[in-house]
Amino acid sequence: MASSKLREPVDEVFDLDLAVPETTRLDSSLHKARAQLLAKGRRHRPSRSRLRDSASSAEDGEGSDGPGGKVTDGCGSPLHRLRSPLHSGPGSPASGSFCLEPPGLRRSLDEDEPPPSPLARYRPLHNAASHEGLAATSGSPPRSAPSSDSSPSFVRRYPRAEPHSEDDSRDASPPEPASPTIGLDKKTRRKFLDLGVTLRRASTSRSRKEKGSNRLSMGSRESVEGSGRTGSSPFLPFSWFTDSGKGSASSGSTTSPTCSPKHEGFSPKKSASQESTLSDDSTPPSSSPKIPGGPRQETKCSYPYHTLSQSSDEFLDESLPAVQHWTSQQVGQWLHSLNLEQYAAEFAARQVDGPQLLQLDGSKLKSLGLSNSHDRALVKRKLKELAAAAEKERKAQEKTAKQREKLRRRENDAKKS
């Protein structure tokens, strides 16, 4: 009696079904199907031995009517169709199934069904314009028999025909008739992308040729642009220096890109003493005031670039001392460059040359007809610039003369020693 009394409360305590009622288990088939689908996407491309094994196992397995059975095409070769649980169901159509074909075999539906259009097998893929690129390549009609170019042995024998890594072969490429075709919806494609699996289209030989031609055209365009840039370059070739010293007729043609007509018209005449010195031998175009010039020199440009030992400041202001040697005609050209051509006749009548121009002040300018204060201020400012540049050039000439003297002394000392 005592033992039966003890058993009753124990049974009541351990009978948990009364406290926690039984519930239906959660449906995890969707998660399992996703895991299987992701695992299938990472599999290697089936080889010939695997195809034979799968064919023999399918013959020994279930009948041809089951979803995992074999379907024979017109040639009698077994063709396996695996359906994903994602799309399988009592009311799901056969076109939405997940189909995996081995290479070298042609997929065919039941004999009573008409052959589908090339876009019909991509119903799960089509989601507006997101898969437009994949559908465009599938527009080629399926061939009746697979060619030898698409077989795996051809790919192994000629690796240059499709130079892609093994990852490319595992990607879901657009449907070649002999390549495995995987129909993926938008959510599954996003899963693949999250896992780092690339779903890109294998490039054909035509696209590679187009890329190569584009690269060639880009290179030729760059070379043409580079030649155009060198043609208009401000730097001169070495043949210019040699021809200009000889005074040959070809120097005029070689210096045509660099000698601008503005500064050629304003280049001053040079005396024999200027030709003998190095600093007076060139008049570059980049000086701040515009310098008038005399008759145009034909065989020689007015600013050859062979004053390499000078500094940049000396090089820019090299032609400014020529104002001391200006004639009245060059003074008139200088006034034209300042848009003061209305006073050029009075300056020419008074025979104002370069040295007289540097000595002009306010009263002399008024006597020359410059009644406008703005014009007088402009002329004074330009004259100050000319005078400052002339002084600077004089100091630069003295400096170069001292450097030459030092070099001569060093050469003499080296010869004596």
UniProtKB/Swiss-Prot annotation:
Keyword Phosphoprotein: yes
Modification Phosphoserine occurs at: S84, S108, S173, S179, S279
Residue positions where Phosphothreonine is found in the record: T283
Residues of the SAM domain: 326-389
Coiled coil: 375-416
Covalent S-S links between cysteines: none
Key words, A-Z: Coiled coil, Phosphoprotein
Protein name in UniProt: Sterile alpha motif domain-containing protein 14
